[in-house]
Regions:
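Extracytoplasmic substrate-binding proteins
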Residues: 107-109, 174, 182-258, 279-281, ...
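Sec-dependent bacterial lipoprotein signal peptides
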Residues: 1-5
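Bacterial Sec-exported substrate-binding components of ABC uptake systems
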Residues: 6-123, 216, 221-251, 297, ...
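A ligand-binding cleft/hinge motif common to bilobed small-molecule-binding domains
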Residues: 181-188, 295, 300-319
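Short helix-initiation/N-cap motifs at beta->coil->alpha
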Residues: 102-105, 154-165, 180, 282-291
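A short, structured surface patch at a secondary-structure boundary
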Residues: 115-174, 179, 275-278
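Alpha-helical, coiled-coil/dimerization segments enriched in small aliphatic residues
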Residues: 143-146, 259-286
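Short helices/loops that flank or line small-molecule/ion binding pockets
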Residues: 162-171, 189, 288-297
Length: 358
């Protein structure tokens, strides 16, 4: 969980353990889209791990064949769905000055691109490298793991514990913070600071963050290409799922039964993929009880940092465990609100609905 938080993703709320006895059982849920392969299940029949279906679920009508969409691979740049009005072309050359409103509502004016950036945020590091401006990053924090090219960037703290002296020694002309704890100390040391809080309410805003950094560093053309690609891939997913009402129930374990609920980017992902979060009454992140998980019996489990549930006798009768429907992501893409976030959505979509997202 610590790694998840420090990567600049949603920040967990204080630990609250709901009592299972006080929670009403959820209503029965519709099944996943019928265009995915149907499975016949008895109580202890093993289903395909990539396609769990609750046995008691009703099946919605399939959409008209002409609406079927083939989802692209993460590497594809030409997308199957393009229904939005075209965005005006980005300027061919950078335009300065650039004014940015920071997290405190203050205007920060850039008369020229910063050359030496301490990017104390995983998402910003990924954005700068994605738009071809990674050589401007001269410092970051210890939890940055992507892209591999960033491994050689000096570390000046552990996400929430910045070494101000080490930061000053790097002689940056801009320090970016996703929280403002060290802002005054850095400014007293004569450094320019841009504070903007981590995205936590809408992953669609990632594209605008990418464009913002393109303006700041004077590379709007590359930023527009990356941002548009992000938006088109999200559009493909949302359009593919638009004709369906509900899929399987889901529990996401961020470690020690901490789980995301309302007001998180992960809940937004669940909404797009029509997954029914068993932690529907959680706000932010909370640690829930084993009893509540057993009571709500998820059809799918996402084990963000390794599967510690399947081998636990407490959870042996869960539908997801019996069907071997426990998904361990191959990366931390869904933990960081940067360009890779859409890859995390695509990977989860292919695992849950292989018939829709081949």
């Amino acid at each position: 969980l610590a790694a998840f938080v420090a990567c600049g993703a949603d920040t967990p709320a204080s630990s609250v353990v709901p009592a299972a006895a006080n929670v009403a059982a959820p209503a029965s849920r519709p099944a996943a889209p019928v265009s995915t392969p149907a499975l016949q299940q008895t109580e202890y029949t093993q289903a395909l791990p990539s396609q769990p279906l609750p046995a008691m679920a009703a099946i919605p009508a399939a959409p008209a064949p002409q609406k079927q969409i083939t989802a692209p691979s993460p590497q594809t740049t030409a997308r199957a769905v393009r229904t939005a009005a075209p965005r005006p072309a980005a300027p061919a050359a950078p335009v300065f000055p650039v004014t940015v409103k920071d997290g405190n509502g203050d205007d920060i004016v850039f008369d020229s691109p910063p050359e030496r950036i301490v990017a104390f945020d995983s998402a910003v590091v990924e954005i700068l490298f994605a738009i071809g401006e990674g050589d401007r990053v001269v410092g970051t924090h210890e939890f940055v793991t992507s892209p591999p090219e960033a491994n050689d960037v000096p570390r000046v703290g552990g996400a929430f514990n910045m070494d101000v002296e080490a930061t000053v020694a790097l002689e940056p002309d801009l320090v970016f913070l996703f929280f403002d704890r060290f802002k005054e100390d850095l400014e007293r040391a004569g450094l320019r600071v841009l504070f903007i809080a981590t995205l936590s309410d809408d992953f669609n805003k990632v594209a605008d963050r990418i464009r913002l950094w393109g303006e700041i560093v004077g590379n709007p053309v590359s930023a527009e290409a990356v941002a548009s690609d992000f938006e088109e891939r999200v559009k493909t997913i949302t359009t593919t799922m638009a004709d369906y009402t509900a899929g399987p129930s889901v529990f996401q374990d961020e470690g020690a039964l901490w789980t995301p609920g309302q007001g998180t980017l992960i809940q937004q992902v669940f909404d797009v993929l029509k997954l029914e979060n068993i932690a529907f009454d959680v706000v932010g992140y909370e640690q829930i009880s084993p009893e509540l998980i057993v009571e709500r019996d998820p059809g799918v489990i996402i084990a963000s940092y390794g599967d510690s549930i399947s081998g636990d006798p407490v959870f042996k009768d869960l539908l997801a465990v019996r069907n071997r429907s426990v998904y361990v992501p191959t990366s931390d893409a869904l933990s960081i609100a940067g360009p890779r976030f859409v890859q995390g959505i695509e990977e989860l979509a292919r695992w849950v609905y292989p018939g829709l997202f081949p």
